[in-house]
Swiss-Prot record:
It comes from Arthroderma otae (strain ATCC MYA-4605 / CBS 113480) (Microsporum canis). Residues 1-22 form the signal peptide. InterPro entries: Peptidase_M14 (IPR000834). This is Inactive metallocarboxypeptidase ECM14. GO terms for cellular component: extracellular region; vacuole. Residues 75-98, 172-202, 548-593 are annotated as: Disordered. Inactive carboxypeptidase that may play a role in cell wall organization and biogenesis. Its cofactor is Zn(2+). GO terms for molecular function: zinc ion binding. Glycans are attached at N361.
């Protein structure tokens, strides 16, 4: 049977300069697309309720946008009746404040099914012209059913959100955050007493992970951890942001007594998040793993052994300025807050600004682009500061970086180098694939969630066809460049042989607006992956020992562990235990890549 690949693009049709937005709607929910008046999930064409806030006459920008999209995709013009009914029905539903309605009220999120390279090129071109934001892609192998369907279904687009402003409103912390959804609220402060069982008898032990936390809460929480666990935890700064904030990090490790004049070369693993400001789940996940390691020392045999072998540097957000901005102004902001050549388009993409294989030519003339890489390598201040810190650790502090994990969202992928080109192969490709598969298995055993493992260059590429016999892609469509990434720089320039970028939950149902209920489950599954990585770097045989549960929340739902967590690397159904065999890794050789 011939198999094709279904490619879905998530993008925001924004009515102003670049807004980022995307959440797929749940199955069975119908939405009336503003340009057509048609329901995307119904068999007929009823006019259904549209939850977009109060109806506003379309602006000139909106009319221009719609006409271009209609010309590209052949969408029929909507009639007056459908527009009137849509407006009337959209008045009542949204509970989002006026500030969010004003910013996001006209935005819609669509999923397009791409079948040809020409359609892909047309959509990418239209997205660039209209400053639309592509959230991501996903591909599924399906039978060649499209040829049996009428053209209207073959070219249909599926709305993925009915009320973006409401979805953003619901994503903010419940307890009086300093956000545009609570314009009168003051900045929250972290209160240690608020997290005790006595004051919150019906909550889990650590209330910190029951919601997304702003920087004003995150920093005091980090200081509190250091004061409580000073024997193996220190608070450091790995740089300064464009707006003058420190980039805080927690260094966790147990240093044995050494009488030598020079300390032994210390192996270090870096876990970072928050490079893209809107990806809140990455900030919470780094914090969760840090808390689990800090509180697990002396209680968990796995954690105790790892902290005796490695220093872990946890950087919850490498983009504090952007993170603060997502709480105060724009929930879907992606870049940092650095000034550019256009005063009304600030910000540089921190994961496109690193020095290795930097390629900003595609966005050099457009600072408004969400992927703007700056005028040159390391123009983004935060990327330059972290790179300088890492180099100094190697040259002055006798540090050897053994691993690097950069957390992002979303799509549930474990990506290894290289991102800039699939033609450039890493020297230890087999080892990267082997450990990547082990991380995915650790996640699957802890939560039953599936994470795909692939090269970073294929994380944003979709294929339209497969070669017979080899199942290799015949044609690939790159949605955006991933040159200049932290992943590639740490691997190549800093020689961190085990570098990964992990894209966290989910696969598109919520996108960047992942509900707070996913914070603890996501943290737990990535905690298990980080533990597995540490054990692999120590010795493959250590993977056979226990992996204890983290100490940062309630127990996992599937209860698939014994008391010591021995089952981490056992396949379901009693299959033999998975064993890693790390092969010899030769010296770094650019010619072999």
């Amino acid at each position: 049977m011939h198999v094709t690949v279904q490619l879905s693009l998530l993008l925001s049709l924004a009515s102003s300069l670049p807004l980022v937005s995307a959440i797929p709607q749940h199955d069975g929910q119908a939405y009336t697309f503003p340009s057509t008046g048609r329901s995307a999930t119904a068999d007929t064409d009823p006019v259904l309720e549209v939850r977009q806030g109060a109806y506003r006459p379309p602006s000139a920008w909106t009319r221009l946008r719609d006409s271009i999209v209609e010309s590209v995709w052949g969408v029929p013009q909507r009639g007056k009746d459908s527009e009137t009914k849509t407006g009337k029905q959209s008045e009542a539903a949204s509970k989002a404040p006026a500030t969010l309605q004003a910013r996001y009220g006209e935005d819609v999120v669509l999923r397009f099914t791409i079948k040809t390279q020409e359609e892909m090129k047309a959509l990418v071109e239209a997205s660039n012209i209209l400053f639309l934001d592509v959230w991501g892609t996903h591909d599924d192998g399906i039978p060649s059913l499209l040829g049996l369907l009428p053209p209207s279904l073959q070219t249909s687009h599926v709305p993925l959100i009915r009320d973006l402003a409401q979805a953003i409103y619901e994503s903010y912390p419940k307890n009086n955050p300093s956000s545009p959804s609570h314009p009168g609220a003051t900045t929250r402060r972290f209160s240690p007493s608020a997290s005790t069982p006595e004051s919150q008898p019906h909550e889990t032990k650590n209330i910190f992970f029951q919601d997304y936390q702003p920087l004003s809460v995150l920093l005091p929480w980090m200081r509190l951890l250091v004061s409580m666990f000073s024997s193996h935890t220190t608070l450091i700064s790995v740089g300064t942001t464009a707006e003058g904030r420190d980039i805080p990090a927690l260094r966790v490790g147990v240093h044995p007594t050494n009488n030598a004049q020079q300390a032994p070369r210390r192996r270090t693993i870096v876990i970072s998040g928050g490079a893209h400001a809107r990806e809140w789940i990455s900030v919470s996940t780094v914090s969760y793993i840090a808390y689990s390691f800090i509180t697990g020392y002396g209680k968990s045999r796995s954690i105790t052994k790892l902290l005796e072998q490695f220093d872990y540097v946890f950087i919850p957000t490498v983009n504090p300025d952007g993170y603060v901005y997502t709480f105060s102004t724009d929930r879907l902001w992606r870049k940092n807050r650095q000034s550019t050549s256009l005063s009304f388009c600030p910000g540089i993409d921190l994961d496109r600004s690193w020095g290795f294989e930097w390629d900003g030519n595609a966005t050099r003339s457009n600072p408004c682009s969400e992927s703007y890489a700056g005028e040159g390598p390391f123009e983004a201040i935060e990327a330059r500061e972290i790179a300088d810190w890492a180099r100094k650790e190697v040259t002055e502090n006798n540090v050897h970086f053994a691993g690097f994990v950069d957390l992002h969202s979303y799509s549930q992928q474990i990506l290894y180098p290289y991102g800039h080109s699939c033609a450039h192969l890493p020297a230890n490709l087999e080892n990267l694939e082997e450990l990547g598969a082990g991380l995915a298995k650790a996640i699957r055993r802890s939560s039953r969630e599936i994470y795909d493992t692939k090269a970073a260059c294929r994380g944003i590429v979709a294929s339209g066809a497969r070669e017979k016999g080899t199942n290799e892609p015949v044609a690939s469509y790159a949605l955006e460049s991933t040159a200049g990434s932290a992943l590639d720089w740490f691997y190549h320039d800093l020689d961190v042989r085990f570098s990964y970028q992990i894209k966290l939950r989910d696969r598109g149902s919520y996108g960047f607006l992942l509900p707070r209920e996913h914070i603890v489950p996501t943290g737990k599954e990535i905690y298990h992956a980080v533990v597995a990585m540490g054990k692999f770097l120590v010795s493959p045989h250590i993977l056979e020992e226990e992996v204890d549960e983290p100490h940062a929340g309630e127990q996992t739902q599937d209860n698939s562990y014994d008391e010591d967590g021995d089952n981490l690397f056992r396949a379901q159904g009693g299959d033999p235990q998975v064993r890693f065999t790390r092969r010899n890794i030769g010296a770094h050789d650019d010619d072999s890549e």
